[in-house]
């Protein structure tokens, strides 16, 4: 039996970062002034944390290798982007930070679309929902890139959080997982 500690840490990390996305997204919509005032610090800390969680996820051994399959390179990218967000000064426009967020969410959603297609190959019925959530997050990512508003950023963060949360809940299985119908698991 394989030690499940690392996969549990990765799954817990993804669920926690999803909750952070939910809270941050809600605050972007409900209190945009507060979020704009502290956006660089908040973004930097979240990006670095998310990058670390992605790298931990990459090295965990889940049954399907779906939830964390692209996370090593993405994790390093997020950490670097987080450091840049923390180091930039006031000369960097908030619209540029929002555009970077939109690009990041678009990239993550495109990789998740590929995860949905791979899930279909494994016969997981959850692939349809992964695809829908990924397309929704990607759409909001594009809107953030084009419009650069804090409200769209909030919606994009909510969609990203929902997508990540669902993917980790429905694709991250331990290697000693006994196969059950995916429909039974979602009850």
Task: Place the predicted regions along the sequence by residue.
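Core segments of transmembrane alpha-helices
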Residues: 20-22, 74-82, 133-138
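C-terminal ends of transmembrane helices
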Residues: 2-5, 52-64, 112-120, 164-171
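C-terminal transmembrane-bundle signature of multipass membrane proteins
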Residues: 150-186
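Alpha-helical transmembrane segments and their membrane-interface exit regions
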Residues: 45-54, 102-112, 156-167
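N-terminal topogenic module of multi-pass integral membrane proteins
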Residues: 1-56, 61, 176-187
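Short, amphipathic, aromatic/basic-enriched membrane-interface segments that mark the entry/exit
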Residues: 4-17, 62-73, 119-129
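Membrane-proximal helix-loop-helix units in multi-pass membrane proteins
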Residues: 80-132
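Hydrophobic alpha-helical transmembrane segments in multi-pass integral membrane proteins
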Residues: 81-89, 136-150
């Amino acid at each position: 039996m394989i030690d499940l500690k690392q996969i549990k840490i990765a799954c817990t990390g993804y669920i926690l970062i999803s909750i952070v996305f939910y809270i941050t997204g809600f605050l972007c919509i409900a209190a945009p002034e507060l979020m704009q005032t502290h956006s660089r610090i908040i973004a930097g800390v979240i990006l670095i944390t998310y990058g670390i969680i992605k790298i931990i996820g990459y090295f965990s051994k889940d049954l399907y290798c779906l939830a964390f399959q692209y996370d090593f390179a993405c994790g390093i990218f997020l950490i670097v982007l987080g450091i840049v967000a923390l180091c930039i000064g006031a000369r960097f426009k908030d619209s540029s930070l929002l555009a970077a967020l939109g690009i990041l969410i678009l990239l993550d959603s495109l990789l998740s679309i590929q995860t949905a297609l791979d899930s279909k190959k494994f016969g997981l019925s959850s692939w349809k929902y992964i695809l829908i959530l990924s397309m929704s997050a990607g759409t909001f990512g594009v809107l953030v890139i084009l419009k650069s508003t804090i409200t769209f950023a909030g919606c994009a963060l909510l969609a990203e959080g929902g997508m990540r949360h669902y993917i980790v809940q429905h694709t991250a299985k331990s290697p000693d997982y006994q196969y059950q119908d995916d429909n039974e698991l979602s009850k």
